[in-house]
């Protein structure tokens, strides 16, 4: 009886531990999580140096978020194998971009991970369009025409320990084309269209239609050819096919 009670207590303790850990993982439908992801992306997109003339305001896409969640749940510290296949990842986009962050759940916030990607700006030379170190996360983050995003978090103890989390963001249309700048250098918003408004140095279209609600949208892209890697995050790089 004592042994049975002991196992019952251990089972309850284990259940509590799982529940405690799971409660820290935000849902892809959590408005607070969504706002944090969008705000951090747009804050850094609006602060690029040199300034961007055509940087678009980024908005949330449910389909990209579902894609990010499905891949995060795989707990693989590598890129989704659908990224180099036309319309394979998500029907709304021919190709999708991807950034991945890995770290402890206690230190995780969307802003923390996204800022880590942005900090790669120090390794990017805008004039030569080259990186002195890994900077693919930065260039995807500030790719002017990648203005749909969906992100997700999952616990992945197999990747480092019980508190290890993986954070995945997917972008549409995909960015990171070789020998192309992520945006047009110039006065902020100077290349916004007539339909767009300048919001915090970003070109924002009022009442923008989200791709997964628009079955007629046919965005285009190029086949991805290269993957960037560092110990803490991954950035998906694309090479333009000539």
UniProtKB/Swiss-Prot annotation:
Its main location: cytoplasm. The keyword Nucleotide-binding does not apply. Residues 1-22 form the signal peptide. Residues 39-171 form the SCP domain. It is found in: Cytoplasmic vesicle, Secretory vesicle, Acrosome; Cell membrane; Membrane raft; Secreted. Gene3D superfamilies: CAP. The keyword Lipoprotein applies. N-glycosylated. N-glycosylation decreases during the transit in the caput. Disulfide bonds: none annotated. Residues 222-242 form a propeptide. GO terms for biological process: fusion of sperm to egg plasma membrane involved in single fertilization; sexual reproduction. One of its GO terms (cellular component) is side of membrane. CDD domains: CAP_GLIPR1-like. Glycans are attached at residue 119. Keywords: Cell membrane, Cytoplasmic vesicle, Fertilization, Glycoprotein, GPI-anchor, Lipoprotein, Membrane, Secreted, Signal. Highly expressed in testis. Part of a oolemmal binding multimeric complex (IZUMO1 complex) composed at least of IZUMO1 and GLIPR1L1; the complex assemblage is influenced by the maturation status of the male germ cell. Interacts with IZUMO1. Required for optimal fertilization at the stage of sperm-oocyte fusion, plays a role in optimizing acrosome function, the translocation of IZUMO1 during the acrosome reaction and the fertilization process. Component of epididymosomes, one type of membranous microvesicules which mediate the transfer of lipids and proteins to spermatozoa plasma membrane during epididymal maturation. Also component of the CD9-positive microvesicules found in the cauda region. This is GLIPR1-like protein 1. The gene is GLIPR1L1.
